[in-house]
Amino acid sequence: MSPQCVSAMKGIAESMQEGENRQLHPGWIPVLERVPLFKALNKRHLKRVARLAELKRYKSGPIVVRAGARGDAFFVILDGSARVETPDGHTRDLHEGDYFGELALLDGAPRSATVSAINSLATARISRTAFLGLLRDEPAMGVRLAHGLVDIVRDLQKA
């Protein structure tokens, strides 16, 4: 991710209040474009997805999502770091511009890992309910997402 994009994300986090929706902030689109699920979406669709994002802040330590809990949102890290831990003990750290929970937008399946704040953490959160509402309003977007999912599956089959 470019330094300009990381800087823009930190700026978003600093300028927003908890729960506030910062519509069409220019920093959102490049971040959403990096998410494999959204790669097939056009700019207009990405802007509609970006409008759904709300700021959510966490102090150091708290769990953001717990393994086994129903997936109800997608998160992009705007500032700070988070730790992902799978039930079998594998861990990895996420930082500005990283994201998690994107498949929860579609299926609401149980979370595969626990994610907790390593330090003060600011995220953009998109709820599954809001996202599904957008898909009902924009059926063409659902078709594009299906194309993106096919690409993801093909890439996995090559690996």
Predicted regions and their residues:
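Cytosolic regulatory regions built on CNB/CRP/Popeye-like sensor folds
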Residues: 1-159
